[in-house]
């Protein structure tokens, strides 16, 4: 059977000809405006959602802390993900919205740059850390919260073009 992912595949840009990890050389790429949007969910009991919305939590402002953690995380992505390029970020916005139907919170991050490579990992890191921080801030109320559906919602700009996956 033929290997569907040969080590020298052009699709595996983070591997060299010997299959060793490498940081992709983007020095010949043109700087363009690039944006990525990612989302995550934190599912919780209705009582936990109500307590967070009312501000009745032992650690303080859950949502403000989670939002700031997400922004800070986007800026640290290259320090967390080994082969990510450090990028100048022009915009990082983290929105945390209550969703009584879940019940819990929807988290959405939008990250924008003018650079040689995209910001998908920065957006995904932002929602992941915002969700983890929300969990940390509210775990005294409920330890059974679930972080779910971390996904890339869209990516625009760059050589590979725009990406809009189908809704889950």
Swiss-Prot record:
In the Enzyme Commission scheme, what number(s) does this protein have? 4.6.1.17
The UniProt keyword set, sorted, is:
Lyase, Molybdenum cofactor biosynthesis
Q: Where does substrate bind?
A: 83-85, 121-122
Molecular function terms, GO-annotated: cyclic pyranopterin monophosphate synthase activity
Keyword Protein biosynthesis in record: no
Give the pathway annotation: Cofactor biosynthesis; molybdopterin biosynthesis
> Gene3D superfamilies, alphabetically?
Molybdopterin cofactor biosynthesis C (MoaC) domain
For the keyword Lyase, the answer is yes
Supply the CDD domains for this chain.
Answer: MoaC_PE
GO BP: any one term? Mo-molybdopterin cofactor biosynthetic process
Which chemical reaction does it catalyze? Answer: (8S)-3',8-cyclo-7,8-dihydroguanosine 5'-triphosphate = cyclic pyranopterin phosphate + diphosphate
Enzyme active site:
136
Q: Which domain of life is it from?
A: Bacteria
Under the subunit heading, UniProt states: Homohexamer; trimer of dimers.
Physiological role: Catalyzes the conversion of (8S)-3',8-cyclo-7,8-dihydroguanosine 5'-triphosphate to cyclic pyranopterin monophosphate (cPMP).
Tell me which family the UniProt entry assigns to this protein: Belongs to the MoaC family.
Annotated protein name in UniProt:
Cyclic pyranopterin monophosphate synthase
* The gene coding this protein: moaC
